[in-house]
Amino acid sequence: MAKEKQEEQQKQTAPENEKAPKKDIKKEASDKKGDQTSKLKEEIADLKKQLADKDDKYLRAEAEIQNMTNRFNKERAQILKYDGQDLAKSILPVLDNLKRALAIEVVDDNGKQLKKGIQMVHDHLVKALNDHGITEIKADGETFDPTLHQAVQTVPVEEGQKPETVVNVLQAGYQLKDRVLRPAMVVVAQ
């Protein structure tokens, strides 16, 4: 009988002993699961942050490329707009010399023929310059504009003249579209 009681006690304690480890195992599993979940959530948050950073960098790079493209196109348009500016500046003295040659009075037939040829060259050169957007700056009788005119001399205002008016052009000025190649050298009434 004592043996039976002992066995019975062992049976009763055994299930109690078995129950205790199951609770610990469940708790451990739950803790491990919670740790893994929090680690995964942290990893997901980190990956989301990295993705947001990459997206931001990508958008900034794309915007920078667009800005560079716009700047390049603008510079290219400026270059094309003012293409030939240096050539035009070097041709202007030739045009001045042709005008001086045309200002000379001739009396004989040979001189008149020569002057006619010079006039044709002058007209052709002016037309070619105009075709490329190079025009003479209007100055005589105009109000003095320091962006277009260079005053080399001033004279007192005479009757019928307005102050700050160009009364004489010493050397013609030229502009390429809206850019001044050479200001007109003028005499201004003051």
Swiss-Prot record:
GO terms for molecular function: adenyl-nucleotide exchange factor activity; protein homodimerization activity; protein-folding chaperone binding; unfolded protein binding. Keywords: Chaperone, Cytoplasm, Stress response. The lineage of its organism: Bacteria, Bacillati, Bacillota, Bacilli, Lactobacillales. One of its GO terms (cellular component) is cytoplasm. Residues 1-41 are annotated as: Disordered. The keyword Chaperone applies. One of its GO terms (biological process) is protein folding. Participates actively in the response to hyperosmotic and heat shock by preventing the aggregation of stress-denatured proteins, in association with DnaK and GrpE. It is the nucleotide exchange factor for DnaK and may function as a thermosensor. Unfolded proteins bind initially to DnaJ; upon interaction with the DnaJ-bound protein, DnaK hydrolyzes its bound ATP, resulting in the formation of a stable complex. GrpE releases ADP from DnaK; ATP binding to DnaK triggers the release of the substrate protein, thus completing the reaction cycle. It comes from the Bacteria. It comes from Limosilactobacillus reuteri (strain DSM 20016). Coiled coil: none annotated. This is Protein GrpE. Gene3D superfamilies: 3.90.20.20, Head domain of nucleotide exchange factor GrpE (2.30.22.10). Homodimer. It is found in: Cytoplasm. PROSITE patterns: GRPE. Belongs to the GrpE family.
